[in-house]
Amino acid sequence: MALIKSVRGFTPEFGENCFLADNAAIIGDVKMGRDCSIWFSTVLRGDVNSIRIGNGVNIQDGSVLHTLYEKSTIEIGDHVSVGHNVTIHGATIKDYALVGMGSTILDHAIVGEGAIVAAGSLVLSNTVIEPTDRKPDRPHAIRP
């Protein structure tokens, strides 16, 4: 069974039909919609600020979602796919976006609706990826 842990008076909340892998860790101020899947060795750390996840989201193995104390939150829209070993730190991912395996998305970045972040990408703080953009075609740093 996944580790579900209350922190600072916040207990994670989940919608209907969510799959939580046995060794996933969901901590603190995390709210997730229905029909989501959180895969093996994934960590959702809502210990210092909030994480909000829409409906139909899948976050694959080994990913880490965390925020910056009192400065950034994570908002993930509906029907988003987050690949294996992704780090999202205090960013916003809009509906229907895809974050490729091994990518890192930093504080206050915004990935637009339907946008694709290629595997291995680094999306720097405050970067805005427009809706339906594919950034980049090959992995490299995306600069604001």
Predicted regions: what they are:
Residues 1-14, 19, 41, 47-64, ...:
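Glycine-rich hexapeptide-repeat left-handed beta-helix
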Residues 81:
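Short proline/glycine- and basic residue-enriched helix-capping loop/turn segments at helix->loop/beta transitions
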